[in-house]
Amino acid sequence: MNPVNYLYLAALLFTIGATGVLIRRNAIVVFMCIELMLNACNLAFVAFSRMHGNLDGQIIAFFTMVVAAAEVVVGLAIIVSLFRSRHSASVDDASLMKL
Amino acid sequence: MSAQLAAYSTSTGEAFQFWVLGTVAVVGALCTVFMKKAVHSALCLAGTMIVLAVFYLANGAYFLGIVQIVVYTGAIMMLFLFVVMLVGVTAADSLKETIKGQRWLALVCGLGFGILLIAGIGNASIKDFNGLAKANANGNVEGLAALIFTKYVFAFEITGALLITAAVGAMVLTHRERTERAKTQRELSEQRVREGKHVPPLPAPGVYARHNAVDIAGLLPDGTPSELTVSKTLRERGQIRDVSTEALSDLKALEQRAEERLERTNSGEGSK
Amino acid sequence: MENLIALLIAAPLLGAVVLLCGGRRLDAVGHWIGTALAATSFVIGIVLFADMLGKNAEHRAISQYLFSWIPVGSFQADVSFQLDQLSMTFVLLITGVGSLIHLYSVGYMEHDERRRRFFGYLNLFLAAMLLLVLADNYLLLYVGWEGVGLASYLLIGFWQHKPSAATAAKKAFLVNRVGDMGLSIAIMVMFTTFGTFAFGPVFDSVGKTGEGKLTAIGLLLLLAACGKSAQVPLQSWLGDAMEGPTPVSALIHAATMVTAGVYLIVRSGAIFNAAPDAQLVVTVVGAVTLLFGAIVGCAKDDIKKALAGSTMSQIGYMVLAAGLGPIGYVFAIMHLVTHGFFKAGLFLGAGSVMHGMNDEVDMRKYGGLRTYMPVTFVTFGLGYLAIIGFPGLSGFFSKDKIIEAAFAKGGTEGWILGGAALLGAAITAFYMTRVMIMTFFGEKRWQPDTEGHEPHPHESPRSMTIPMIVLAFGSVFAGGLFSIGDSFVHWLEPVTGHSEGNSPVSALTVTLATMVLLVVGAGIAYAQYGRRPVPVVAPRGSLLTRAARRDLLQDDFNHVVLVRGGEHLTRSLVYVDHTLVDGVVNGTAASMGGLSGRLRKLQNGYARSYAVSMFGGAAILIAATLLMRAV
């Protein structure tokens, strides 16, 4: 098996995650899909790391994880406060950008 | 496994592992997207993440594999579940699309994007894999540490600052300053008396032989459920179960069953 | 002595500032302050004049540098004055006649509650006019030029409560702007051509400049002169300017300001001498105007407007003379001075008549006034004799010289110009005799005014008659004084130069012809107005009369050509603007609006919709990258 397959898998997972972001309305699920996309990227980085024979890809993946953790913390806090004020976790309900 | 082999191909064991676990990961991802309940989505995502952790390990990223399990699956996904519980675990989403054409556009874009991405990877024609044998010679964790604390030290420090900011931000977002003193039990009861309603304690939730839960409203004398009997949090989530008609339908079902049985005995007698 | 020059201007300027800023507390004495300061300026003028007479002709010109006004690189404008014989003549005329008219106004404006302001404006005018004639460069002259324009505007519209006065002031101002534009452009051309606009350097470098440029400058200066001096084609404002108080008409619109154009042409003689084409145009303008004004003057029943036509005509004479070059410069100025005396006297006389007749201006409602106001009659009569050129009086000397000079121009032009001037003299005799007869002779024709007040003609107060008497003396003797031994010619010659020319006809012939025409003109007038009673309501009259009553259709001409033309131009521009420009603009806006209305639908507020477009964009980017790699 060629390790390139890991990259194909990453691409597939990323696309599934992105599509999920587009079609789900529940903010928490949307958020999970974003996490899925980030994980797909991490997989690609790890595969790249193996491909190039150095650890830089793993470092980037590590940083991605840290940033993802920070993002989850803030994002979930936003969802909680949104839910508190609007009693809903639907991203469409927050369509206040439209007049 | 020789280093030469690692450059071009992997062991059969890894190939087998990839095809089995890869399928699991894709199914998990699809379930994450298409499950109606957020809890199920979260569990499926956790499964996918564990599969990814295994892949990390297979790719020589031992540290990341462990971190993936401990931090991602263990901490972050649990945070997700925690929030799901907070927001309402039973609130199933309707998957019906509300924005016209959104689903089609999303599918077209997703398909196009995926095909293009995969075509791009195929187009890149990556042949040689160097393998991490040399890089991991002193141990994966040591190698990572050497990079993080030398080459990437500034990024690392800035990431630390980002984490602190995120923690403070989350607290600021969710924290609500109490502007007035919480009322004591005594004050609450005095207020109730002054306002003249609900002078006695609030009614208890419905207690039935077959249901005994806080999410079932107690029935008023005329048979309608009283929302007062259910906790405020559940009321706000809309998670009150209405069982007021269940008793009647149960009775109807009972009568029907009894009739069926009686008829059968009647017919049995008749045949005798 | 040089330092006194600035004082000439400073005195009336101080008066203007004090009177205009002093407020009501000066109401009681304001007119005397104004008169005293004008007289101060006159006394300074006399002192300077005496000083000048004591010097040789070559050393008479003096100058005073006050301060550097706009020093910007090569653009050096100074406030400095030059007092030579030409300026001196004007200074004496302006301050002398000005002081007399100040004195006259004390009586004339006695019942006007804004008299202080009136005197402030008069002083402002004096200051500006003196600045105009004393400036030693064109830019400073321009300041004075605009200053007198402003004073003229303020004084014509002094009775601003009358819509006609306000309109007349506006008209004078606007028409003058056209001429001022000529002067300002002339100054600009001068600066680009000569690098300076001071009189001396400009005139010195005339010889080194092409004739075309000089002709252009000359024509622009002529345009300026036409505006200020009411020459054809910018003459239409002068008749309406008679809406102003009579002393204003006498001072500004007869004796001084309207002659500024003549001063400009004579002062710029060096330029005109080198540009014969411009000179020819000047003479043509002068000849046309002198006939034009005379014809208008024949038809007007309003005494002041008849005199205004006469002013126009007389200035036409001066411009004609000024256009003749060195043959005529001296006589232009000489006629200017004598005209200043007798026309101011005539206007003051007219003012005196109006003063006695409840401000009635229609001569058809006068008649037989000689017994009621004898002083006015005598002074007016002397002015009349002077203007028609009765032998021995001022007009005789100065006008005769101009006619002679016109013939001396030589060639066909000389005959045409001389003929026009002779004809003008005959018409002058006609219309002035008409004014004289209709006002002072014949039977009484006055009627009660609309409020039923029967006019009681009476002689004017002393403060009004004294200036009239003084001016009458001037009208009688000035011409003779100037002509004895050609004293005026010798006086001005160092500045303007002089040449006799070679007249095809002798001076005696011209004089005799003038006399004959004078008698003919006066005789016709007598036959028409003296022998027969004058109808109170004007008869319909011939086509020419009717046209002349309407100022020979000058306003109609302006209306049709300029106003209508402007309106049509504006309308067509508005049409183009509405259809083409607005069409393009509105069309663009509408199409943008429509497009936006459709694009707006994309902006539905749903974050997921936006995410789709982002995602699609990312897909397109990948496609583009792949395509680029493939290519």
Swiss-Prot record, chain A:
Q: What class of enzyme is it?
A: translocase
In Pfam terms, one family for this protein is Oxidored_q2
The record's listing under InterPro entries reads: NADH_UbQ_OxRdtase_chain4L/K (IPR001133), NUOK/Mnh_C1-like (IPR039428)
As for membrane topology, the entry says: Multi-pass membrane protein
TM spans, by residue? 3-23, 28-48, 59-79
Superkingdom of origin organism: Bacteria
Where the protein is mainly located, per its record? membrane
Q: Which GO terms describe its biological process?
A: ATP synthesis coupled electron transport
Subcellular location, in the record's words? Cell membrane
Q: Could you say which EC number(s) this protein's record lists?
A: 7.1.1.-
As its record notes, the protein acts as a catalyst of: a quinone + NADH + 5 H(+)(in) = a quinol + NAD(+) + 4 H(+)(out)
Gene Ontology MF: a single term: NADH:ubiquinone reductase (non-electrogenic) activity
Q: Which terms are listed as keywords in the entry?
A: Cell membrane, Membrane, NAD, Quinone, Translocase, Transmembrane, Transmembrane helix, Transport
Q: Which GO terms describe its cellular component?
A: NADH dehydrogenase complex; plasma membrane
Looking up HAMAP family in the UniProt record yields: NDH1_NuoK (MF_01456)
Per the entry, what this protein does is: NDH-1 shuttles electrons from NADH, via FMN and iron-sulfur (Fe-S) centers, to quinones in the respiratory chain. The immediate electron acceptor for the enzyme in this species is believed to be a menaquinone. Couples the redox reaction to proton translocation (for every two electrons transferred, four hydrogen ions are translocated across the cytoplasmic membrane), and thus conserves the redox energy in a proton gradient.
Q: Which family does it belong to?
A: Belongs to the complex I subunit 4L family.
The record's subunit annotation is: NDH-1 is composed of 14 different subunits. Subunits NuoA, H, J, K, L, M, N constitute the membrane sector of the complex.
For this entry, the protein name equals: NADH-quinone oxidoreductase subunit K 2
Q: What species does this protein belong to?
A: Streptomyces coelicolor (strain ATCC BAA-471 / A3(2) / M145)
Q: Which gene encodes it?
A: nuoK2
